[in-house]
Design a protein with these regions (language model features):
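Intrinsically disordered, low-complexity acidic/Ser/Thr/Pro-rich linker and tail segments
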Residues: 2-111, 199-200
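Loop/turn segments within WD40 beta-propeller blades
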Residues: 91-98, 136-145, 185-192, 232-239, ...
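Conserved beta-strand element within WD40/beta-propeller blades
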Residues: 101-105, 148-153, 195-203, 242-245, ...
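WD40/WD-repeat beta-propeller blade N-cap
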Residues: 77-87, 125-132, 173-181, 223-228, ...
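Blade-level signature of beta-propeller repeat domains, shared across WD40, Kelch, NHL, RCC1
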Residues: 356-388
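Per-blade loop-tip surfaces of WD-repeat and WD-like beta-propellers in eukaryotic adaptors/scaffolds
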Residues: 64-73, 112-122, 160-179, 204-220, ...
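Short coil/turn segments within WD40 beta-propeller repeats
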Residues: 107-111, 154-158, 201-209, 248-251, ...
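Solenoidal tandem-repeat scaffolds enriched in leucines and small polar residues
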Residues: 179-187, 193-261
Length: 388
């Protein structure tokens, strides 16, 4: 395996001092008591102006919009399986303050890119024997390190990487014996980290979901009759839930108590399989290939909200921007901004050549909040910023 590094070292980011607001409020309160009436009236008028400005800011926030910033790379590749299975790239801020973008090339290499300093870090050539369709990052708090796993579809292997020197720490061969592995994720229990892999019933063998320790040994298997395209974990209070995306529905499994937890979604069989899944604040948001978004109560399974845009396009990757706004990668080569509260399509963003597989949000110093999108096949990875 050849690892090719960029010789330039990324610049260190400047530390930002945080202002102690509570001390300022205390000082201001004491000074107000010493003011005469006219001075207090002036302060009150300033407060009214500030409140008016705050209302304007809220109004601006409701008119959320984005602008194309730049193409990060034109060398990325996302296999057709990727958009409905996992994350075709990952972005994260590492412990050593590098803003990583990790993606795959058509040559089955893993590419590492520093977003903040706009430079390539390294390339791992021939990282897998087949197209890489899923990346996951995890911060190991116990050992204070960043971990990365990559999943390839038909070489059936999972690899765990050290991102600081780009060596393969662990290779799990034949993680799924049916010949296709679509998705894998990290599972953390009592500060111990495990790798959990999806199954696939292409050959109708009904392989179980497998959980491996970081030595590659299987510690647990969970049997499912469904073929799993997407897998992830959701943590709430003292419970760990495994989130499973299938062609027909979304399933949650209570890992802590070893039992099935819930079923979500009612359109999988008639409107296309589920392609994007997020769990946030006890709500599960799922999009499907038929252009429908369902928002469900995670614990009861009840559908709280439904947005049908099947006349526009099919949906792939989803990204929750804030409590009210969702970004969705679509089959019509756009990213759509949807207001969940109003159930309305607010904006469409153009520029990709093919289906948009994955959309993710990140904060980058000097740029601010932004999102990154990737199209399937040999498309670009694009960076978008908030319009001010």
């Amino acid at each position: 395996m050849n690892v090719k590094y960029n010789s330039e070292k990324p610049k260190k980011s400047k530390k930002i001092k945080l202002f102690n607001l509570s001390n300022e409020q205390l000082t201001r309160h004491k000074s107000l008591n010493k003011m005469n009436n006219s001075e207090k009236e002036n302060i009150n008028s300033i407060n009214i102006q500030n409140n008016t400005q705050n209302e304007k800011n809220k109004l601006k926030q409701s008119d959320l919009d984005f602008a194309f910033y730049k193409d990060l790379t034109s060398k990325s590749y996302a296999d057709d399986f990727s958009g409905s299975c996992g994350y075709t790239f990952t972005i994260f801020r590492s412990i050593n303050e590098i803003f990583y973008l990790i993606f795959a090339s058509i040559e089955k290499s893993i590419m590492s890119y520093d977003i903040k300093n706009n430079q390539k870090i390294c390339e791992i050539k021939n990282a897998h024997n087949n197209y890489i369709i899923d990346f996951r990052h995890f911060y190991d708090k116990k050992n204070k390190r960043d971990l990365l796993i990559s999943v390839s579809s038909f070489d059936n292997n999972i690899k765990l990487w050290n991102i600081y020197n780009w060596t393969c720490i662990l290779e799990i061969k034949n993680a799924n014996r049916t010949g296709a592995l679509y998705s894998a994720s990290f599972l953390c229990e009592n500060n111990e980290i495990y790798i959990i892999s999806s199954n696939s019933n292409l050959l109708k063998r009904k392989d179980p979901i497998k959980i491996f320790n970081l030595n590659g040994a299987i510690i647990k298997q969970i049997k499912f009759s469904n073929s799993i395209d997407f897998i992830d974990c959701y943590y709430e209070i003292n419970n760990i839930y495994i989130i499973l995306g299938t062609h027909n529905n979304v399933i949650s499994y209570d890992y802590t108590n070893n039992k099935m937890y819930n079923n979500y979604g009612k359109y999988g069989q008639t409107k296309g399989h589920y392609t994007g899944i997020i769990v946030h604040n006890s709500k599960l948001i799922a999009s499907n290939f038929g252009g429908i978004i369902e928002i469900c109560d995670f614990h009861t399974g009840e559908v709280l909200n439904e947005i049908n845009m099947s006349i526009c396009s099919g949906f792939l990757g989803v990204c929750l921007w804030d409590e009210n706004n969702l970004l969705v990668g679509c089959t019509d080569r756009t990213i759509k901004l949807i207001n969940l509260k109003e159930k309305k399509l607010k904006k469409c963003f153009y520029g990709h050549k093919y289906f948009v597989a994955t959309v993710k949000k990140i904060y980058i110093p000097k740029i601010g909040d932004c999102f990154i999108s990737q199209g399937m096949t040999s498309d670009t990875i694009k960076l978008w910023t908030v319009k001010k």
